[in-house]
């Protein structure tokens, strides 16, 4: 999680989406959040975008599409195949702000708010068998999807 955040922050600075001073402040705030044990708030992008207003998340998504040739997706409007819903490692998804959501032929589709982070890319490349097509999405989109997935998993366990 810390590596994903550190490299995401570095990528935001490298691509001139945030200033180094803002990243330093966001990293300090991130350490406070980690110390408080608020796992789902552990996002340097969220701090920069929503607490500090140093970058708009939309600008990061637009950079992903325009400069990296990736797609964009809102998982609320996509029916994720059952094979991906059942095998999901929610801990890894929360740590990387990414969700594998489909596969066509040899290609895995991964939605990520952290697609600019080399650590996130490398993690999913080692986890998935085959090439990855990256789709940018919002932090809220990932959080909503994972929250619903976790709620559904709890409901399934209590109904059996």
Model-found features: residue ranges?
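Non-catalytic accessory regions
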Residues: 1-151
């Amino acid at each position: 999680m810390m590596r994903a955040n550190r490299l995401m922050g570095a990528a935001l600075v490298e691509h001139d989406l945030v200033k180094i001073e803002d990243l330093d402040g966001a990293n300090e705030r991130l350490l406070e959040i980690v110390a408080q044990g608020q796992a789902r708030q552990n996002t340097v992008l969220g701090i920069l975008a929503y607490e500090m207003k140093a970058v708009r998340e939309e600008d990061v998504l637009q950079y992903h599409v325009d400069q990296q040739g990736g797609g964009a997706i809102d998982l609320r409007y996509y029916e994720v195949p059952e094979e991906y819903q059942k095998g999901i490692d929610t801990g890894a998804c929360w740590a990387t702000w990414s969700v594998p959501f489909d596969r066509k032929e040899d290609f895995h589709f991964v939605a990520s708010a952290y697609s600019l982070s080399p650590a996130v890319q490398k993690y999913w490349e080692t986890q998935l068998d085959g090439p990855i097509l990256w789709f940018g999405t919002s932090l809220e989109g990932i959080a909503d999807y994972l929250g619903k997935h976790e709620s559904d998993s709890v409901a399934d366990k209590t109904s059996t």
